[in-house]
Amino acid sequence: MNIGEKILLLLKEEIPEIEYNRYIKHLTYDTKKSTADNAIFYVPNSLVLSWIKNRYSSKIKHLFEIQNSIKVDVSILLKNQVESKKAEQKSVQKQQHSLLNPSHTFENFMVGGSNQFAYAAVKSVSEKAGVLYNPLFIHGGVGLGKTHLMQAAGNVFQNQGKVVIYTTVEQFLNDFIRHVRNKTMERFQEKYRKCDVLLIDDIQFLSNKEGIQEEFFHTFEALKGVGKQIILTADKHPKKIAGLEKRLQSRFEHGLVADIQPPELETKIAIIENKCKINKVILTKDIIHYIATVIESNVREIEGILSKLHAYSQLMHVDIDLQFTKNVLKDQLQENRANLTLDIITQNVAKDLNIKPSEIRSKGRSKNLVYARRIAIYLCRELTQNTMPQLAQYFGMQDHTAISHTLKKIGELMQNDEDFKVKIEELTNKITSSS
């Protein structure tokens, strides 16, 4: 017999039998949650709850204190409310879990020099939550893999049985507003402060929102104070987020700040090959190199391009070759390169070859200058919509036949010299990534 049952027997001796049978016998003692100084009972309905609280809660408290020789708090709760709350918590957890994309794993994240540090940091945190780097702040441009890495850690934590909440700042804000309107802030705070791991995307959108920054600060402190892991992403370093409170900026920097840079050519090639494998798209090495060379740094753009190529191929019943790829991506590449100018391309070539832009456009005929000029002309033709006469005028040539001759020479080199081809691809990648 537990202490709760013993108290009810003592109470039975002191009250009328009819009252005991009608009300007291329905009390259920919670042996798991009750402690020596805190007794918890459940009742089946509000009528019994009201009657016992009004008439016998003080008596029950007195009997407990006699038995335990210490002051005891007695809680009498409605059973279906407790069960409803548990169900709601499970529903919330399930909903948050479902927001994690199961395909975002460490295994299918392509690691290169541009993201190696961030990858290593997130991987380490997933192995020792709340111990190594807390918070972990990941920043970088759109489509570089911040969310993938964050959710990869979330999936690991979830598989360990931890309660993981993944959300964006926008969702966090909407949730906050809804609970304020409904006067249920306790539920909001319990939801976000009782989890084991909090993952929040796009933290820069806290900017200039004082009320939500205040609430997030207290949520952050509550979780950090008990060693719960926090991972945040943003498009820039905490110091560069305008309108972010100094105390939040300080706490974000107190953990580890890791950045992700645009992928270099080799990483883009690896990403394309991996996406082809996942999506069962067959591309030749030349096409993969072409896509990696001409697209910008956004990894999401790679996925879109592969989907577009696959769809065109299926609908038009044609094989995907290099010319087909160029035709399909023509409009998209023009849009991407709208900001590229002849000056920008020439400056990039000059910088790469350690000469002055003015020398490339000069009449100089030294071997180095001719080599640099030919590369600049080829890239200007490939990366802009300028005509050959326009290029001839820009580079100080008499007419477009000289441009045509240069393009032919570079084309031959690209076919016969693999090292030169790689050089052009890397230079193209630098120019398009920085535009």
UniProtKB/Swiss-Prot annotation:
One BP annotation, GO: regulation of DNA replication
Region (Domain III, AAA+ region): 99-313
Keywords: ATP-binding, Cytoplasm, DNA replication, DNA-binding, Lipid-binding, Nucleotide-binding
Gene3D superfamilies, A to Z: 1.10.1750.10, 1.10.8.60, 3.30.300.180, P-loop containing nucleotide triphosphate hydrolases (3.40.50.300)
Compartments (UniProt record): Cytoplasm
GO molecular function: ATP binding; ATP hydrolysis activity; DNA replication origin binding; lipid binding
Pfam families listed in its UniProt record: Bac_DnaA, Bac_DnaA_C, DnaA_N
Region of interest called Domain II, as start-end residue ranges on this chain: 70-98
Main localization of the protein described in the UniProt heading: cytoplasm
Region of interest (Domain IV, binds dsDNA), ranges: 314-435
Residues noted as binding ATP in the record, renumbered to the chain: G143, G145, K146, T147
GO-annotated cellular components: cytoplasm; plasma membrane
Stretches for region Domain I, interacts with DnaA modulators: 1-70
Free-text function comment from the UniProt entry: Plays an essential role in the initiation and regulation of chromosomal replication. ATP-DnaA binds to the origin of replication (oriC) to initiate formation of the DNA replication initiation complex once per cell cycle. Binds the DnaA box (a 9 base pair repeat at the origin) and separates the double-stranded (ds)DNA. Forms a right-handed helical filament on oriC DNA; dsDNA binds to the exterior of the filament while single-stranded (ss)DNA is stabiized in the filament's interior.
Free-text note on domains in this protein's UniProt record: Domain I is involved in oligomerization and binding regulators, domain II is flexibile and of varying length in different bacteria, domain III forms the AAA+ region, while domain IV binds dsDNA.
Subunit structure: Oligomerizes as a right-handed, spiral filament on DNA at oriC.
Family membership: Belongs to the DnaA family.
Protein name from the UniProt record: Chromosomal replication initiator protein DnaA
Gene behind this protein: dnaA
